[in-house]
């Protein structure tokens, strides 16, 4: 049954030079531009429970994953970290680089920068206020400039459809390496225009990024916890540049995703870990489907980064224009129930088509939790709950480990 259309969103084509596309949003998918927010709650939580980088907040499991990576994944990740290090190092000092050209007397540079970013290969480019409420606590002093340029780079289509696989991990992390170099070029261009440009590496961000991408109109949050961008859904890798260049902010857009996900729910139904939840909740001031991190993490670590929730998303596979047109024409979710969209394989468990999920023992989900030092204390509590009193040597060893964990938090990076 053909649906009534509420509005049509016009967006630039997938790559620079492509014609604009139109995305029809059905009336029954209309909610709000961006994401439903309770601004007072976002501000409150940022003050009393500031966000922290996963490498500190989830430090215990970030160390643990290295013990379960396959040799191939571990080798590739070590190589990636080495290749990224100079890029992350240069991003860290980029705020202090002086503009190299004369400023253009306050001329609005939004479209100059957008065009340059598109020419460099970024598929989605948007501008918004750098919202300090999403800063990580340990990087509070890093943010120097008021405007955020949100940049999304598409990762390879074919490699992504093989998720979960080492090949798909290449698509993921190779894109980080490529876009970091392109981001550095864009920052150089902004300095030549006479302004500062601070790079926020995709491997060492200073804040949560998705809320600012949504504010800049580059997509909406999907039930899989990822940004669904118009052309490639969550098959995009995100980075930001902050600047003091004069720019005009874009506005959040209602693509219909907030409501569409509740009709689709493919990612929720196909997640092997049952880590995605059907019902939206209010979380730190935003209404969303909240991922259960502790269920996702072991599957991600053991099955090559998993990413099944990305692979099975119709927006990722077919793009938003095709999916929304299909919904308007039929009232159905394009590809739902098909092996092509929903099927996947896990290396030791085989193939799972629509309606079939793997099972795991309860112990599979018993992994280290929380910060490194908190996990050490948890283990210590268990140790002294037994009958034995620790020896002086064990106490010294425990203190050394806690000190080392705390020191690591001070120097840690999201690499
Ligand atoms: S990465 Fe895998 S385990 Fe984690 S939420 Fe997505 S589908 Fe589920
Ligand atoms: S799979 Fe469906 S429910 Fe999940 S993010 Fe994609 S569109 Fe939303």
Predicted regions and their residues:
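Catalytic cores of enzyme domains
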Residues: 103, 114, 123-335
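Non-catalytic, usually N-terminal nucleic-acid engagement modules in DNA/RNA processing proteins
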Residues: 1-165
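Flanking helices and flexible, charged tails adjoining ferredoxin-like Fe-S electron-transfer domains
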Residues: 1-31, 282-415
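Compositionally biased, intrinsically disordered low-complexity regions
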Residues: 15, 19, 36, 128, ...
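Short, structured coil/loop segments at alpha-helix boundaries
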Residues: 70-73, 107, 254, 338, ...
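Residue-identity detector for threonine
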Residues: 30-32, 53, 110, 128, ...
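Arginine residue identity/basic-tract feature
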Residues: 11-14, 38, 47, 62, ...
